[in-house]
Amino acid sequence: MVDSLTLQPVALVNGTVNLPGSKSVSNRALLLAALAEGTTTLTNLLDSDDVRHMLNALQALGVSYQLSDDRTTCKVDGVGGPLVASKPLELFLGNAGTAMRPLAAALCLGSNDVVLTGEPRMKERPIGHLVDALRQGGAQIDYLEQTDYPPLRLRGGFRGGDVTVDGSVSSQFLTALLMTAPLAEQDTHIHIKGELVSKPYIDITLHLMRTFGVEVSHDNYRVFHINGRQTYRSPGDYLVEGDASSASYFLAAAAIKGGTVRVTGIGKKSVQGDTKFADVLEKMGARITWGDDYIECSRGELRGIDMDMNHIPDAAMTIATAALFAEGPTTIRNIYNWRVKETDRLAAMATELRKVGAEVDEGEDYIHVVPPAKLKFADIGTYNDHRMAMCFSLVALSDTPVTILDPKCTAKTFPDYFEQLARISQLA
């Protein structure tokens, strides 16, 4: 019997949500803190599955840290160089792409013998473009099951030099190379093949590397230059900003059924590109106010939009369900990389939107949504994908309830999401 949660129709949303730490920032910061010289105290760390997988891996690799009882403050003792496994190891990383990709690169420094593996879905998430680039730099990597996919056996050997990486599937491959390159013996020049997707996520990586004392130069995101033989240095304390992708659900809820909702922990100074989601809501007709460490959204008459959302792929999913409440159709374009996330998000989104009555055209890299006159009650499959569960909670902002199957899958980034949503919701 699969777990389910039925959300009753909501009349109004109003209030403030303090966001959990960003997943993208948390796992990058943990890895850099481990590689750095000195001790780093990370605050507002995300407590979630993905971060737990990174912490477990670092511990197995001999990194010592102290985690607070609420798991949101972590004091990491850096090793001041590459991570070295004292014996052959197998690390299980669940379905955490933000742990798998950066660790796959970092463990190619020196001479390790480490296997990285994960859940069945992880073995369907491509990593070939990263492996190709690491091999160009001298890394010894074997595929243990299917070519181009985890599990991987890593035996060190990455020295740097000239490498080319395909940027068209995931920016995490470039992120992994960037974070590893400063510790290589030689300087590294990373050439990007194809169109670089999700560029703002690269800015998060460069910001964090700078925070830990390493500068990267690039020629308009086409070629990146990183000096070798560097050392990351702990900044001492680092505050992880709130998760901008997680903010999207609350901001969209306010746009549909506000009141006014304020999310704190992100704002106009945020390093995350997903804060641009607020601009999309504004284009659709919502009212947005920006503070240094908050974004506020109030209800407006929403209109459908047609937009390239390659720069905000995770938050763009929220637009697909917000579109159910807009006047006219919505088209979200250039989102092929939805297909290689926690699930094939394009197929999943199309299937579930049709269940609630929308007319949907699913293309190779776009989705076109025509909202129904009235939403239908449905059981929503979540595909073990945290974002599917959170996106479809918005259906309850109508006069129709919605049932979310396996609601606990939000644990990947936001374990108490449904409690937070209930806290700002007034039932019809």
Curated annotation (Swiss-Prot):
Annotated metabolic or biological route of this protein: Metabolic intermediate biosynthesis; chorismate biosynthesis; chorismate from D-erythrose 4-phosphate and phosphoenolpyruvate: step 6/7
Residues that coordinate or bind 3-phosphoshikimate: 23-24, 28, 170-172, 198, 314, 337, 341
First-tier enzyme category under EC: transferase
Catalytic activity: 3-phosphoshikimate + phosphoenolpyruvate = 5-O-(1-carboxyvinyl)-3-phosphoshikimate + phosphate
The keyword Glycoprotein is annotated on this UniProt entry: no
GO CC annotation: cytoplasm
Catalytic residues of the enzyme: 314
Stated name of the protein: 3-phosphoshikimate 1-carboxyvinyltransferase
Keywords carried by this UniProt record: Amino-acid biosynthesis, Aromatic amino acid biosynthesis, Cytoplasm, Transferase
Subcellular location: Cytoplasm
Family label: Belongs to the EPSP synthase family.
EC number: 2.5.1.19
GO terms assigned for molecular function: 3-phosphoshikimate 1-carboxyvinyltransferase activity
Main function: Catalyzes the transfer of the enolpyruvyl moiety of phosphoenolpyruvate (PEP) to the 5-hydroxyl of shikimate-3-phosphate (S3P) to produce enolpyruvyl shikimate-3-phosphate and inorganic phosphate.
PANTHER family: AROM/DEHYDROQUINATE SYNTHASE, PENTAFUNCTIONAL AROM POLYPEPTIDE
Subunit structure: Monomer.
SUPFAM superfamilies: EPT/RTPC-like
Binding site for phosphoenolpyruvate: 23, 97, 125, 172, 345, 387, 412
Gene3D superfamilies: Enolpyruvate transferase domain
Pfam families given in the database record: EPSP_synthase
GO biological process: amino acid biosynthetic process; aromatic amino acid family biosynthetic process; chorismate biosynthetic process
